[in-house]
Swiss-Prot record:
This is Centriolar coiled-coil protein of 110 kDa. The gene is CCP110. Pfam families: CaM_bind. Highly expressed in testis. Detected at intermediate levels in spleen, thymus, prostate, small intestine, colon and peripheral blood leukocytes. Residues 64-82, 781-821, 909-924 are annotated as: Calmodulin-binding. It comes from Homo sapiens. GO terms for biological process: centriole replication; centrosome duplication; ciliary basal body organization; negative regulation of cilium assembly; positive regulation of cilium assembly; regulation of cytokinesis. Residues 1-223 are annotated as: CEP97 binding. The modification Phosphoserine is found at S170, S366, S372, S400, S551. Residues 49-90, 640-709 form a coiled coil. Residues 611-633, 949-992 are annotated as: Disordered.
């Protein structure tokens, strides 16, 4: 073929010429210049002329116009939809701004309570009325879009679920108005609360405090780009109206009779806004809500929310797998026991938000269909100041109502004796060297911690020691340093850094389950044995989830073994659950690859006011020690973690050695089995070799006169040399199937034991039919090399190519045999006859005679028989029978050639005039009788007539009698009849037994058909 550069130059020149003059295109078309060349020969000549090309261009243009119209209509529909949403927003009444000052006064309190409703754990005994709660819940949703005029206000980034009781905010409002993140989400607290100064966090990703309001419309790229400016204007107007509305409702306490199902529906569609705002972080404790499709209930939010207690609770950074969005931020306040309120509708909206965060999994069925507040109200329980930190993914047990109730019972024990908040919290810094939660949740999902539950890390992370470096936050989550300044407890700085780690299976040294000393007293009603039972149960049954997977519930990873390697801490008894060492080893065997992927986590030391990060080696903690004291774990520094890591590394070395020994043992067993199998196959090959040698004598005398014979002899040589190799390669392929070199041998194996018609060419004839043409000429002793090494992929490709070439040649050779030629001609003639018969048949049904119908049936039967014959030759017969057809065809051709050669050698004899005339007459009669069924009769008659009439030619016979005796009148009459019957007989093949009567009838019907 021509070089690519030349081809490009020619193509460019041709295109330029065509662009200069369109008239030059016509001769190019007429010359049929093709751009595709095969060995220099142009193929695929262009079939389009200028007119057809223009038509094609017109059709293309029409299609483009239709597509453009569709896009325009789609954009118009989107714009009208957005406009309708905006119009619906404008219809709402704007409340008076009279109560706006009251809102300003309550901002400080509301900032401190921003996420109190986000906490699934309940609060001390006394609850406010449902009216109080409803108002607070409404204000939580309404307060999301206030301007940040107070620098001390807590800036939170979350989801704008600002909806009043009439549900004015349509689902698309969050997208269209670009107010998807809540600037200030706070609750004007109506009940008495202890005044507290606003706490300011200096988190590295915190929102700028002087953030202007118009940034709301610029942060998120609007899906409706064409109306961006319009939407910005509308959003500003909407924000102004909402400010006055919030100020009006800040002091009103009334029950929110709001459809929770509508909230759920609206929250699902808010997902786009939320996901784009997910990278912003609040100023204070960020309680990250997990991205779970199944969080449909308020108590399921235990996995996502850091519990804000009535006492001074440290902000907790609870981050979860695949969480992109810190939903709410806030800082807890020191509340009196009667100042807490129930958590009902916000949980509904939070759950709806969580559903919206799940993306494609948002429409999965929820375990509980009801979103009624009653479900939440009956689960509301009092709790002393406790940070309930739950590492999700949640397990299947918690998705059921009973499982969730049990989870709540484990977390929220009866703490009536501990309702006095100031008495509980001072004990915690002394015991835990920090403000630690009085209860650490050891729930059913303890085994599901993504970070490979390590030496007492049973889903518990002690916030007090500042070691809550959650390593399940992915996609570059925010780092939040929440400085909490309490008016009663003093300063406790907790830098909870949530670093963006792709997949941290490592725990932190200090974040091993640090059980609070008050756990036993707080959760007095629930025995620790139940916690142990839950931990052990979930350790054995549940699975962890891969951080990189899109959905932690649906995309489960087999990381259960990593979590089940190490024991859990029973926080009530401060001891590990008893997992057998064999189970740990068995799972360590399976987790060697997973260890290589682990990143170095951070270790946050247990100091009160600082947080150290230390890189841990990429090894997990061993199964080693059985009991770990809480205070000891808090007091130990990174040295202890290093020792644990060293022991873990030693355990891994032991496991590696053990694996290597097992691997070597398995290999030795496999090799021994291979040797036995190879010996068995070698015996079979020897037997086949003997059989082939015996059969070779039968087929060795094939004729060598024909070229095709020479080709087949070549095939036999190739087959003879390759059969033994193939059989040996099969023997190896049975043992080396684990290696990559067994691809070809397996294919040879499959071919050698099936019917020979689908086998490769070098195995053709290996069946036990009489015409087997394969023989093994090489002795078996040479075949000691491993043929699986010889048959590489390259050799396999060559053998496949040779097989294809041989099969193609034999197929073409079969098509040229007389048998197949006759069958093909029969098919062609019968189909032509049937077609003509149908075209000549009367148009009206019922006129076809029985004779014509039977004739057509016989022709159809003959066509069917011919087609079946062709099918049998190519698809039913084995290779030996096909080769016998070729052999017979070669024999017939050789006989013909020999006869022709004899004729050529014999000298021609001079013929007399009478003999020449008789020969000419014979030729004429044969030409007239082509296709006639009574040809044999005519051939017999002509020589007899000439022989009888020859002596009488010179005697006194009359001329007409002489002519009659010579057959001239009969010949002329028969010629007329034959000429009349030719058209019908030409449609009938020679093998059709059609009599002259049927042919004559068809001939007589033709004028009638023509006149109709």
């Amino acid at each position: 073929m021509e070089e690519y550069e030349k081809f490009c130059e020619k193509s460019l020149a041709r295109i330029q010429e065509a662009s200069l003059s369109t008239e030059s295109f016509l001769p190019a078309q007429s010359e049929s210049i093709s751009l595709i060349r095969f060995h220099g020969v142009a193929i695929l000549s262009p079939l389009l002329n200028i007119e057809k090309r223009k038509e094609m261009q017109q059709e293309k243009q029409k299609a483009l116009d239709v597509e453009a119209r569709k896009q325009v209509n789609r954009k118009k529909a989107l714009l009208t939809r957005v406009q309708e949403i905006l119009d619906n927003v404008q219809v709402r009444k704007a409340p008076n701004a009279s109560d706006f000052d009251q809102w300003e006064m309550e901002t400080v309190y509301s900032n401190s309570e921003v996420r109190n409703l986000n906490v699934p754990a309940t609060f001390p005994n006394s609850f406010p009325s449902h009216t109080e709660h409803s108002t607070a819940a409404k204000l939580d949703k309404i307060a999301g879009i206030l301007p940040l005029d107070n620098e001390d206000q807590c800036k939170t980034d979350g989801i704008d679920l600002a909806r009043d009781s009439e549900g004015f905010n349509s689902p698309k409002q969050c997208d269209s108005s670009n107010i998807s993140h809540v600037e200030n989400e706070a609750f004007p607290k109506t009940s008495s609360a202890t005044p507290q100064e606003t706490l300011i966090s200096d988190g590295p990703f915190s929102v700028n405090e002087q953030q202007d309001l118009p940034l709301l419309a610029e942060v998120i790229p609007d899906p409706y780009v064409m109306s961006l400016q319009n939407l910005m204007k509308k959003s500003k107007e909407y924000i102004e109206r909402e400010q006055s509305r919030r100020s009006l409702r800040g002091s009103i306490n009334r029950i929110v009779n709001e459809s929770h199902l509508d909230k759920e529906h609206d929250a699902v569609e808010v997902a786009d806004c939320v996901k784009e705002k997910g990278q912003l972080t609040g100023k204070h404790c960020v309680s990250v809500i997990p991205d779970k499709p199944s969080l449909n209930k308020s108590n399921v939010l235990l996995q996502g929310a850091s519990t804000q207690a009535s006492s001074m609770s440290m902000p907790v950074l609870a981050s979860f797998s695949k969480v992109d969005i810190p939903i709410r931020t806030g800082h807890p306040t020191v509340l009196e026991s009667n100042s807490d309120f129930k958590v009902i509708p916000t949980f509904v909206t939070e759950n709806n938000v969580i559903k919206s965060l799940t993306g494609s999994y948002a429409k999965l069925p929820s375990p509980e269909p009801s979103m009624s507040p009653k479900m939440h109200r009956r689960r509301s329980r009092t709790s002393s100041a406790c940070h309930i930190l739950i590492n999700n993914p949640i397990n299947a047990c918690e998705l059921s109502p009973k499982g969730k109730e049990q989870a709540m019972d484990l977390i929220i024990q009866d703490t009536d004796e501990n309702t006095n908040v100031p008495e509980i919290m001072p004990k915690l810094p002394t015991d835990l060297a920090g403000v630690c939660s009085s209860k650490v949740y050891v729930g059913k999902n303890t085994s599901e911690v993504k970070e490979d539950v390590v030496l007492g890390k049973s889903n518990q992370v002690c916030q007090s020691s500042g070691n809550h470096l959650e390593n399940k936050v992915t996609h570059g989550l925010v780092t939040v340093e929440g400085q909490l300044t309490s008016d009663e407890r003093g300063a406790h700085i907790m830098n909870s850094t949530c670093a963006a780690m792709p997949k941290l299976h490592e725990p932190y040294a200090s974040s091993q389950c640090i059980a609070s000393p008050n756990f036993g007293t707080v959760s007095g009603l629930k025995p620790a044995s139940m916690l142990e039972k839950n931990c052990s149960l979930q350790t054995e049954l549940n699975k962890s989830y891969d951080v990189k997977n899109p959905s932690p519930l649906l995309m489960q990873n087999q990381n259960t073994r990593q979590q089940m390697d190490t024991p859990m801490v029973s926080c009530g008894n401060e001891q590990f659950l008893d997992n057998s060492f064999e189970k740990v080893k068995r799972r360590l065997d399976l987790d060697i690859d997973g260890l290589q992927k682990e990143n170095c986590p951070y270790v946050i030391t247990s100091g009160i006011t600082e947080q150290e990060r230390q890189h841990l080696p990429e090894k997990r903690y061993p199964k080693g020690s059985g009991f770990v004291n809480k205070n000891k774990m808090l007091g130990t520094s990174s040295k202890e973690s290093e020792e644990l890591l060293k022991s873990k590394m030693l355990a891994f070395e032991e496991m590696r050695k053990r694996l290597e020994e097992q691997h070597a043992q398995q290999l030795s067993l496999l090799i021994a089995e291979q040797e036995r199998e190879q010996e068995r196959l070698q015996k079979e090959i020897e037997e086949q070799e003997k059989m082939l040698k015996e059969k070779k004598a039968m087929t060795a005398e094939a004729s060598e006169l024909d070229i095709n014979n020479a080709v087949e002899l070549e095939w036999r040589k190739i087959s003879d040399s390759s059969l033994l190799e193939t059989m040996l390669s099969q023997a190896d392929s049975l043992h080396t199937s684990n290696s990559n070199s067994s691809g070809f041998t397996n294919s040879a194996m499959q071919y050698s034991f099936v019917s020979a018609n689908e086998a490769p060419f070098y195995l053709w004839g290996s069946s036990t039919s009489g015409l087997t043409k394969l023989s093994v000429t090489r002795p078996f002793g040479r075949a000691k090399t491993r043929w699986s090494q010889v048959f590489s992929l390259e050799i396999q490709a060559k053998f496949n190519k040779i097989t294809a070439v041989a099969k193609g040649f034999l197929t073409r050779r079969l098509m040229q045999t007389d048998k197949l030629k006759q069958l093909r001609q029969t098919v062609k003639d019968t189909m032509e006859f049937i077609r003509s018969f149908q075209s000549e048949a009367p148009l009206k049904r019922g006129i076809v005679s029985a004779q014509d119908a039977s004739l057509q049936e016989r022709v159809l039967a003959q066509l069917r028989a011919a087609l079946y014959g062709i099918h049998d030759i190519f698809f039913v017969m084995d290779a030996a029978e096909r080769m016998s057809i070729l052999h017979h065809d070669r024999e017939v051709r050789k006989e013909k050639m020999l006869r022709q050669m004899d004729k050529m050698k014999s000298p021609r004899v001079a013929l007399s005039a009478a003999t020449q005339k008789s020969l000419d007459r014979k030729k004429y009669m044969k030409a007239a009788e082509m296709g006639m069924p009574n040809k044999k009769f005519l051939v017999k008659q002509n020589p007899s007539e000439t022989r009888v009439l020859q002596p009488n030619q010179g005697q006194n016979a009359p001329v007409h009698r002489l002519l009659s005796r010579q057959g001239t009148p009969k010949t002329s009459v028969k010629g007329v009849v034959q000429n009349r019957q030719k058209p019908s007989q030409s449609r009938v093949p020679n093998r059709v037994p059609v009599s002259g009567v049927y042919a004559g009838k068809i001939q007589r019907k033709r004028p009638n058909v023509a006149t109709i």
